[in-house]
Amino acid sequence: MVALVGDAELDEGNIYECLLEGWKHGLRNTWWVIDYNRQSLDGVVREGLYDRIEKTFATFGWEIVTLKYGALQQAAFEEPGGEALRNWIDKCPNQLYSALTFQGGAAWRKRLLDELGDQGDVTDLIERRSDVELSDLMTNLGGHCLPSILNAFNSIDHDRPVCFIAYTVKGWGLPLAGHKDNHAGLMNPAQMAELQTSMNVRSGREWDWFEGLAQPDDKLQSYLSAVPFNAKGTRRHNAATVPVENFPVISGSDMSTQEGFGKVMLELAKSDSALAERIVTTSPDVTVSTNLGGWVNRRSLFARDEMADIFRDEKVASAQKWIFDPKGQHLELGIAEMNLFLLLGAAGLSHSLFGERLLPV
C-alpha cells in the first residue's frame, strides 16, 4: 500500500495513532511518500521539522529514505566547488530557500555570491550557469527528480514500512512557486496561457489524456495498459452478501440496551454461523464495559502472532480470557478514537478493497 502524504498533514493527531497501531501489529508492505515542501497553508514550517519527522517514524520501526537532491544538484556537487554549494543548501533556512525560489535565478546568484564570497571553484560553478539554469539547479530537489525517485523506490528490498521524505517546492514550475501565500493564490489568465503554451497543450484539448506529450497516443496507451497497476484489471472487488439465519433473540427480565447487546454478541460468538465468522468487533475504550467481554472470550483478539493470556496461565482470577491470535475477531484500540473510525471504514469496505466481506461492530 502506497500513500502520498503532505507534510502539513503530519499536524493531524490521527497520523500518530496510526503509527502506534501499525507498530503494535508489525505493519508490513507500506510506503508513505511525504511531500516535504516545507510550506503549510499560509506560511513556512518551523526549522527542524525534518528531524522530528525522521525520529518519529524511526521510533515506530520505519525505514527513512530522504530524497533531498535531484540529479542536477548531485551532478553539480561533483564539480569543483560542489561541496561548498551542498553545505550552503543544507544550512539555508526554509523561509529563505522559499523566498529565493520565488525571486528566481538573479536572486539566487546574488545571495550565493554574497554569502559564499569569491571562493574560486564555487564561484565558477555559479557563474557558468545562466539565471534560468541556476534557478533550475537550485529547485531541482529530490521529490521533483524522477530518476532520484525511481532509484529510491528500487533500492527497497524488504517488506518493512518505509517513509520517503521527498523535498519539493510548493507550486514548482509555476509563477507562485515558493511564495508563502501560494496556498490560496490563483494564477491570472495571462499566466495560465503561458503555462499552457509551455506544456504544448492546445486550446480545446486540455482534457485529452496525452495532450502535450511527445510520444504517440497509442504507444502511451499500450504502455499504461501493460503496467501491473492496470494489467490485473479492476481493483474494485466484490463479495457475496452474508446470510443471516437464526439471529439470536434475547428474552427475559428487563435489561439495558448495553446488556442486551452483550448477550446478542455472546450468542453469536457461540454459533458457527456465516454471520459470526464475518463479524469484527472493536472498541475505542474499555472492551469489557461495552459488554464485549463474552464475545472476546470466545473469539479472541486479533494479532499477527499468537500471545497467551499470562494472567490466565498464572491462574490469576479473571472473568476475561485475553488471548491474541491471527484468527482473532476483536481489535483492541485502547482509546484511539480516530483509529476506530478509520478501522470501521476500512472493514466496511473490505469487500471492495480485498474481495472479502467483513461486518464491523
Sequence positions of predicted segments:
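Long, well-ordered, tryptophan-enriched scaffold segments
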Residues: Y36-M255
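Generic beta-strand/beta-sheet core signal
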Residues: V2-V5, G13, V33-D35, V65-L67, ...
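A short alpha/beta connector and helix-capping loop motif
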Residues: E12-D35
